Amino acid sequence: MAGLQLMTPASSPMGPFFGLPWQQEAIHDNIYTPRKYQVELLEAALDHNTIVCLNSGSGKTFIAVLLSKELSYQIRGDFSKNTKRTVFLVNSEKQVSQQVSAVRTHTDLKVGEYSDQEKTQCWAKERWYLEFETHQVLVMTCHIFLNVLKSGNVSLSNINLLVFDECHLAIQDHPYREIMKICESCQPCPRILGLTASILNGKCDPRDLEEKIQKLEEILRSNAETATDLVVLDRYASQPCEIVLDCGPYIDKSGLYQRLLNELDEALNFLIDCNISTHSKERDSTLISKQILSDCQTVLLVLGPWCADKVAGMMVRELQKYIKHEQEELHRKFLLFTDTILRKIHALCEEHFSPASLDMKFVTPKVIKLLEILRKYKPYERQQFESVEWYNNRNQDNYVSWSDSEDDDDEDEEIEEKEKTETSFPSPFTNILCGIIFVERRYTAVVLNRLIKEAGKQDPELAYISSNFITGHGIGKNQPRNKQMEVEFRKQEEVLRKFRAHETNLLIATSIVEEGVDIPKCNLVVRFDLPSEYRSYVQSKGRARAPISNYIMLADSDKIKAFEEDLKTYKAIEKILRNKCSKSIDCGNTESEPIVDDDEIFPPYVLRQDDGSPRVTINTAIGHINRYCARLPSDPFTHLAPKCKTREFPDGLYRSTLYLPINSPLRAPIVGPPMNCGRLADRAVALICCKKLHEIGELDDHLMPVGKETVKYEEELDLHDEEETSVPGRPGSTKRRQCYPKAIPECLRNSYPKPGQPCYLYVIGMVLTTPLPDELNFRRRKLYPPEDTTRCFGILTAKPIPQIPHFPVYTRSGEVTISIELKKSGFTLNLEQLELITRLHQYIFSHILRLEKPALEFKPTVADCAYCVLPLNVVNDSGTLDIDFKFVEDIEKSEARTGIPNTQYSAESPFIFKLEDYQDAVIIPRQVIYRNFDQPHRFYVADVYTDLTPLSKFPSPEYETFAEYYKTKYNLDLTNLNQPLLDVDHTSSRLNLLTPRHLNQKGKALPLSSAEKRKAKWESLQNKQILVPELCAIHPVPASLWRKAVCLPSILYRLHCLLTAEELRAQTAIDAGVGVKSLPDDFRYPNLDFGWKRSIDSKTFISNQSSSSVESESDCRLNKTTAPDSAASSAANSVIYMQINDQMSVNCTPPCQKSLSHLQTVCFSDDYKAINGISCNGLTNGDWEAESAACFQKDERITCKQEIPEKSTSFHVQNLPKENQPILKECTLSNSDGNVSKPTSDECPSTCTSDMHYDSGLSNRHSSKTLGPNPGLILQALTLSNASDGFNLERLEMLGDSFLKHAITTYLFCTYPDAHEGRLSYMRSKKVSNCNLYRLGKKKGSPSRMVVSIFDPPVNWLPPGYIVNQDKNSDKWESNETSGEDVMVNGKIDEDFDDEEDEDLMWRNPKEETDFDDDFLEYDQEHIKFIDSMLMGSGAFVKKIPLSSFAPPDQNYEWRAPKKPPLESSQFPCDFDDFDYSSWDAMCYLDPSKAVEEDDFVVGFWNPSEENCGADAGKQSISYDLHTEQCIADKSIADCVEALLGCYLTSCGERAAQLFLCSLGLKVLPEVRKLVTNTNVISASSSYQNSTRDNCTLTARTNTDLSSCKGIDYGYLKIPPRCMFEHPDAEKTLDHLISGFENFEKKINYPFKNKAYLLQAFTHASYHYNTITDCYQRLEFLGDAILDYLITKHLYEDPRQHSPGVLTDLRSALVNNTIFASLAVKYDYHKYFKAISPELFHVIDDFVQFQLEKNEMQGMDSELRRSEEDEEKEEDIEVPKAMGDIFESLAGAIYMDSGMSLETVWHVYYPMMQPLIEKFSANVPRSPVRELLEMEPETAKFSPAERTYDGKVRVTVEVVGKGKFKGVGRSYRIAKSAAARRALRSLKANQSQVPNS
């Protein structure tokens, strides 16, 4: 037998490349890709009466249901008007309901079910008529139908389709037969479909079979069609070469074989003879023993003694377990007996051979033959095949797409990552063989594998084999599995995975692998035991599917004769079935023809006339077409293939027509030329088709299918010039950060007044609009409304300042509204006056505010941003404000101006107290008390205690009186012992007054309980700070003005930002034509506010609404009297004021606690739950419960460890040098949102801040709609959450994001009517990518205008007139010493007192003092460690700062990374997302809205040493100046662009937003060349037309406009003209195809004008009967974006004002495939769905059943699983993506049909979605993955994907210390979420058991 000739890949004439196993789904080159057999069967059944012979029941349902659906247009309508009906016949009653539910699930037809023969027998004709009238499909048993026919109740001519289930019964005497007899007499006869799965049972004679089939065909008057699963699987696939090998008998030379056999026989006989009486209940004691011994015997017979020895050894081990666990004596004895026998066998073998090495004498001839075959497959030495190509071929069936969304550009990286792990390449030796050996018994497989491995060690020829075995143990889908089987199961899947990945090249398997297991196409299949029946033969043969393969059957000599007979039978059966195979072409002959040079017959299609030019010949054309179809977009269930029909004409010529899948742009059938034979006709038509595809650009110039990156749409992808690459990180990502200068508004640039030049004087109006409510005024301080005193500040500049909205600052007295009003202009000042003013300006910033520091220099003439701040007062009785020169001069003269007057009092000239001097005073204690000579403390006098004197009792027991305290402690004698004492307050060191102190981030008030405690504290004397007037000097600046001065940094900063925003608004008006360039003089935007009022809980601070409004009105009047000229100058404005007061008086008043901006509170708002392990101790101290508890709402879990001992004093973070202060990223108000709920659609009522109801006083001509957005709203869009302001861009960004997607989608859809979804998707993802948006934003100059870090005047604010002095900067700071108690940092002494707590009471009660100096606070140990590590661990300050660390206050220091993390905490991984550096160096933050992939977010303490951005980024450092520059991540810029879009959308409507996008360079509207250049060309939509009365309107574009100069205008998108293809009888086809859809239109309450849209929305790519419209993919692409936008917009406008985090969660909960699919099923979309895809059919079937059982909607694919028990292999029920798709495509269809009306779509969809929106808004669902990662941020780790045996994906998540959890699903995402869900369930179960300690 040495001459065995096998066709091995290596020897094949086509060269070795062909048989590569990884040519898995080889694209056929000479025949069209075969379609699924069910599809072919359906086609046949539609064409003629058919008997379908199938293997499985499920396939039958598919064909029957789809056939009735296809023919349903014949049965819709009135029975009385001769409409027909469909009848399903079944054999028995119980099958009725199965059929009924199948038809009901997949169609909207009315189904009647009749199973009770008795009952129906007595029905009269009328009753039956009624049944036929009311139902369209009737399912009944055959007996009932026979009766109906016999009694003449209905005639067969009324029936269009008759389905016979189990039609093989018709051969016998059966009602089926009689029914068919009646049929014969009837004309026209209904269409007949017979279904049978049992035409082949066991062995049968081919002749009988043929007869049976013929007879059946006659009876049912049909053609039998067999499914290809009964013949070899692809009827086109090349058949394997079948070989039967006679192996000859085993010659037992040594006699060992016989001895072993005898031993086993005897033992078995003994066991059989043991006649132990077993009761039926008891188990048979000998059972296990018999089983083991007979298995051993089989191995001996089949494989020989060597293997018998091996198996005996294995069995002995297995027996030990049984013996150990066996309780019963008798059983045990039998087991021991068996054990002995096995040991004996082993001993016998050992005498003959050494078990270690394989001796060929002791194996059977079969094994030797097998090894011989395997040797033939030995590969040539190290052939390196280029198999990479295959792995990356995305349209292969087994290509796993990891990405579920096309739009995310971060996805690409991920895909690469994941693919790397998947494709472990085969070693060079596994690259040829891919084989399976089928054996019958499990043990045979195990031992044969062992033998092959052993042989490989000994025989170098076999060394290439890497084998494994798999037995059917536990692979069955539905058996219950125990733990041990589970382990088995896992192992087997691993085996299959390796075989699939070609890590092993030989699989030894039991017959289980014949069916249903997904394995690659093999090129060798060996039947070690002969197949015993046809089914087994076909199934194992069907595994040999590689293009060149061998199917070898090994036969023992004695069996070979009998088997040859069997084989003949099998062949004959196969032949009969093949003939019955639908449209079978006997392809044997075509393949065997020699390949002639057909070019002669039909010339090839050549691109260029040169030799190497790409060409398609008649022989390669079919391959090109197949490849093209495989690249069209489709889902995992559908493999698109061309359809070719060949007809023979009478003249003997053949002609083929080729139909491409319906989502190819080439829609018309292609008719080929007439040819001599069918094969050539097929090829010729393919060649013509290639030519056409190339002409329309579907094949590229290499004649390969173009990818989505197609050249054709190049213009859409004008990707900008490549980014500068010096910056590490991927453009557009969060990891890439760059520096930008901070913008300076044009009107403030170089605007320092010059002598003799005209100036503008603006007054800074300040009015207390919401006084601090009593509950918050803990110290019972008097409130000081700024309008009570006339002296105030003004701004002197050389340029006019545009009007900006009034805005609030929050002082100790409450909310103060700031206005900037022009006082006078055009006047001039002389040099002397200007110098005086300039000196005072510097004095304010350097002395009062102490903002001067070595790094800053005052050079008003050089500074970029320079204007003067100066005091104004009512001068010379005129009652108008003007510059207060007298006051300025007084200050210059005063000796207390800078230092402290050295007045000495003595007994002779004692101190004299004058009350009026102290009424409005700031006092400075004399040096003796405080050590700071250079920077003494300043105090406001809060109260004069006339009843106390220095002799009054001192509050703490150490000293008798105040006088004694000063004497003892400071050796001071007082000269006046009758003077009253002063109660003082610190002047404020908190300079960031942008947001109130007592509100948490959301504008929610802090709870009052803690307030009560504090009030008590402030009422006791002990906690007041008391000074003696004699020991203090009075400062020349009065307290009232000082209080106003403290507001200056916040006012000027806010002014600056608003002017920047206003400038952006004006710029956009020019570029985009949205809004006007300069605002009308009489117009002012409504005030800036934080939008909290509308989202406030009912629990506000003000108990009585009415009283507050009264109060505010009086404020307003007062303001009129005191400053008639300023804030309330016009009636219109006063109206605004009152309204604002009404609103503002609710609860936006600041308290008097410590500043939020310096983080005394650790706030986690609802959506940022605290995470275990952030230790808060570094952040707050004794005061912790008061403030931070206040920040947690009732329902929040606080999991911070509170290790902060209560102390009487409190350590303030303030006392750290500024840049060392820790801060919580989300600490202040970042979570709220300025623009609250302005609906974006035009007609909704406006409730938005930016358009508060101010029309009453303003003329209606102006609104943000016409003028452009409120600068306040623009500012919100420019503010990142890191800026910790009262608003940020997050909500607007989400709205902008979804509108952007919608605008671009609509544009692409309308502009490229021929592009299929894959291409549209690709173009969209490029346009909306962060990278693209970042580039556009950068081009527009957004980065400079953005507000990225917290406003901290001492650190990062440059006062007007100052410049940053670089040289001084570095010299000064490097030489500065960092030791000594009063370390100066930023020119601030570290004892910078907080305005609130009086740390330094000179006589404070010293509880267990760790006596630091008097005025240093006590720290607990934790704090000290914290501060030490902050100050010392950080090393010295140097000049550069590392990239991605936070900027220092000036650019000259850097943190050298601490050696260990500053807080004793584990090193958290740090996610640097959106972190803009500000001056905070110890950082702990969490911000889920900036989540990493899959919503994981990380909480971490920042540690610069760990930061790595790319390989070498760590080394590179960005050095920048905090005052004038800011460092921003690319992604933040992209976010800002989206937020600006959201801002234009909410203010000016959708058209304006589209124009804004166009002006950015994102084309979303078609360009129109302008012809007219006359003045006002209104380019706005009609809704603005009414505003044309007045020429300051909207987009009146004159020819001075930039855009007009370019001559470009933007038109409107046009709906693509055709949605139906030209087709001879299109209308008729359309009516057929959408028959029944009117019910659906009623259900959704929208009648389509153009029904073709409706059809298109429901047509799946696999549905080739629709020849008149496209499939739904394009509409789905459109609908997806529309629904996303509509839902996001709805959520954004929700009056509940969801925070950004909640908004994100809600959006992802509502806009996802699961929800859409569930809704689609709920509203019956699936019943109208048109698809021909068996797998999809079953998935939908399962899903619908599941939904019915569940009967309620699920969020976040939440509990989508069948049962709790199926824990181990929890597989989420699969959500058919197609269902979600048609939900979206219908939205797209309505949008197009209604003339692009979003309102119409929402009108249809809102009622469907409302219940869910309500349900989720009330209780926001989160994705399981995110929830798990929030619960276990440190310990949950997801594994990469593994493939399971049936081709699904498994993901394991390990929660360290709590277990591993697995999830399975069709994609990585589904599996991941299933795993997370199981982990959560387990963790939650454990939590509930362990009550929280």
From Swiss-Prot:
Which cofactors go with this protein? Mg(2+); Mn(2+)
Q: Where does ATP bind?
A: 54-61
The chemistry this enzyme catalyses reads: Endonucleolytic cleavage to 5'-phosphomonoester
Query: Which parts of the sequence bind Mg(2+) 2?
Result: 1676, 1781, 1784
Domain spans labelled DRBM: 1820-1885
| Location of the PAZ domain | 886-1036
Give me the stretches of Acidic residues compositional bias: 404-416
**Compartments, record wording:** Cytoplasm
Instruction: List the molecular function annotations (GO) for this entry.
Output: ATP binding; helicase activity; metal ion binding; ribonuclease III activity; RNA binding
Q: Where does Mg(2+) 1 bind?
A: 1293, 1371, 1374
| Motif DECH box location, chain numbering | 165-168
Q: Where is the Helicase C-terminal domain?
A: 424-593
Quaternary form?
A: Component of the RISC loading complex (RLC), or micro-RNA (miRNA) loading complex (miRLC), which is composed of dicer1, ago2 and tarbp2; dicer1 and tarbp2 are required to process precursor miRNAs (pre-miRNAs) to mature miRNAs and then load them onto ago2. Note that the trimeric RLC/miRLC is also referred to as RISC.
Tell me which family the UniProt entry assigns to this protein. Answer: Belongs to the helicase family. Dicer subfamily.
Q: What does this protein do?
A: Double-stranded RNA (dsRNA) endoribonuclease playing a central role in short dsRNA-mediated post-transcriptional gene silencing. Cleaves naturally occurring long dsRNAs and short hairpin pre-microRNAs (miRNA) into fragments of twenty-one to twenty-three nucleotides with 3' overhang of two nucleotides, producing respectively short interfering RNAs (siRNA) and mature microRNAs. SiRNAs and miRNAs serve as guide to direct the RNA-induced silencing complex (RISC) to complementary RNAs to degrade them or prevent their translation.
Q: Which PANTHER family match?
A: DICER-RELATED, ENDORIBONUCLEASE DICER
Spell out the protein name for this chain.
Answer: Endoribonuclease Dicer
Organism, as annotated: Xenopus tropicalis (Western clawed frog)
Q: Which gene underlies this protein? A: dicer1
